[in-house]
A protein has these predicted regions:
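Hydrophobic h-region of N-terminal signal peptides that target proteins for export
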Residues: 10-17
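Positively charged n-region of N-terminal signal peptides that target proteins for export
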Residues: 1-4
Length: 167
């Protein structure tokens, strides 16, 4: 009886250890800086649009302490007539605001469900401050693909490429 208990206990410890190692392996894949390759909006009918233009730029950074920082911009936005960012006209400010998303906060990975949660501390979109934003993740080659849940009948898919050494 004691022998069976010890064998069962050893199996359980091995199983838990493998699960923890898998979570850590997935966690390590996120660490580093990623550059935005593509950002698309997918309507319910399958129509695709480009909310930050067809050639958006951006970076997402994940560090080992659970911090995340994101910036996405539309490079097609026209420059302001003034060099002072606070003196733009409404015709300059509106597209500039709509062509930018930036936030930072903490992240946690729910490896079993392939979800990463960004807990937002500050954001260019004020409604997200203090919220958790969940993203389904997938690693494909040297890319990280993040998908939002449906937001107003639209799902966003962002493809990021790892900068530097591949993990």
């Amino acid at each position: 009886m004691e022998k069976h208990f010890l064998i069962g206990l050893a199996f359980l410890v091995t199983l838990v250890s493998c699960h923890e190692r898998t979570d850590k392996d997935i966690s390590n894949k996120f660490i580093g800086t990623w550059t935005l390759v593509r950002c698309i909006a997918i309507q319910q009918d399958g129509t695709i649009s480009f909310p930050y233009g067809e050639k958006p730029v951006g970076q997402i950074l994940y560090d080992t302490k659970g911090n995340v920082m994101v910036e996405i911009t539309n490079q097609e936005i026209k420059k302001f007539s003034s060099e002072n960012p606070f003196l733009g006209t409404p015709d300059e400010i509106i597209p500039a605001y709509n062509g930018l998303l930036a936030y930072y906060g903490k992240y946690k990975i729910l490896a079993d469900s392939s979800i990463i949660v960004h807990s937002i501390t500050a954001s260019s979109f004020p409604n997200w401050v203090g919220q958790d934003q969940a993203r389904r993740f997938e690693f494909k080659n040297n890319n990280l693909i993040l998908r939002t849940p449906s937001i107003s009948s639209v799902q966003y898919e962002l493809t990021w490429e790892k900068i530097g050494k591949s993990k």
